[in-house]
């Protein structure tokens, strides 16, 4: 390929990250090695990783440590009692157990506090007679 044909940014989406980037995955796993490389060097290479998982506490520390933005959906009290959530103020911990579908709490170093966001309902669900 010629340089002009290579995209300047590559976006990778991974669902169920805990299957591939868990603390329990063997250290010699080729998928884990690639994930660590992407999370540790990806930004400088123009690679953006979006990952989703049910339990942040299960994810490898080096993967979590290189994530700038975290979006938290509804979770349970057992999960928020883990050390990964020790920085979360009690009011937000309480919110995390009661979030509705489409509601998230965002954490990013740019913001001084956590943000509660709500995605709008799809247009076809907003009206009874559609």
Explain the meaning of each model-derived region:
Residues 101-130:
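Conserved P-loop NTPase motor module
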Residues 1-95:
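Conserved P-loop NTPase motor cores
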């Amino acid at each position: 390929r010629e340089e002009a044909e290579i995209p300047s940014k590559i976006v990778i989406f991974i669902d169920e990250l805990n299957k591939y980037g868990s603390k329990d995955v063997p250290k010699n796993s080729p998928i884990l090695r690639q994930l660590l490389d992407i999370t540790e060097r990806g930004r400088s290479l123009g690679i953006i990783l979006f990952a989703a998982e049910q339990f942040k506490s299960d994810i490898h520390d080096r993967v979590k440590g290189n994530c700038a933005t975290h979006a938290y959906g509804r979770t349970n009290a057992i999960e928020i009692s883990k050390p990964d959530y020790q920085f979360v103020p009690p009011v937000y911990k309480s919110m995390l157990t009661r979030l509705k579908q489409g509601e998230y709490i965002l954490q990013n170093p740019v913001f001084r506090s956590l943000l509660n966001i709500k995605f709008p309902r799809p247009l076809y669900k907003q009206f009874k007679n559609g």
